[in-house]
């Protein structure tokens, strides 16, 4: 682990953008983050999960920003809040990938609140994914599509309205 990313800096990289395609590690527990990330990014789960369990002590955007701020990072870091991460944090992993579950009004308000907190902490906006080919890892919901793909247009509309009000970005991969 070399947080300064000196090799990247030597190659002229000045900014690293993370949290795209609905996958961030801001809100959800370590095991859920590993399930979201490892298969999509082809990084072995047996390496990612122990590292997350050891080092991920945050569960809010404020704590995440504080974690990043305390490290001597070489490049600038900017991040999106991943929609799959947001859905898992609010609905739990199982409901977030249940095609029959529709978020309640309270669920949607909770998502909006967490997105607003992330924007307040300097995150760029929300990233989402509508491509059903990216799959979860782990043994609990393995091979189901990412949680963002299960969102209704109503859910997207509610979150996008907040992004528009705040002048924030909605990054998405199309189907």
Predicted features by range, described:
Residues 2-112, 117, 121-125:
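Divalent-metal coordination cores built from histidine and acidic residues
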Residues 62-73, 100-175:
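Histidine/acidic residue-rich metal-binding segments in metalloenzymes
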């Amino acid at each position: 682990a070399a947080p300064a990313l000196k090799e990247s800096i030597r190659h002229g990289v000045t900014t690293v953008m993370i949290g795209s395609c609905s996958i961030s590690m801001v809100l959800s527990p370590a095991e859920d983050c590993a399930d979201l990330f490892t298969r999509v990014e082809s990084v072995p789960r047996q390496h990612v999960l122990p590292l997350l369990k050891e080092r991920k002590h945050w569960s809010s955007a404020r704590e995440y920003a504080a974690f990043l701020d305390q490290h001597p990072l070489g490049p600038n870091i900017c991040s999106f809040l991943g929609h799959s991460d947001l859905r898992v944090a609010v609905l739990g992993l199982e409901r977030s990938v249940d095609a029959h579950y529709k978020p309640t009004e309270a669920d949607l308000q909770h998502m909006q609140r967490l997105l607003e907190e992330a924007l307040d902490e300097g995150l760029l906006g929300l990233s989402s994914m509508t491509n059903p080919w990216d799959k979860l890892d782990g043994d609990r919901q393995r091979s189901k599509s990412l949680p963002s793909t299960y969102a209704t247009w109503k859910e997207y509309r509610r979150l996008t309205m907040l992004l528009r009000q705040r002048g924030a970005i909605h990054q998405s991969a199309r189907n």
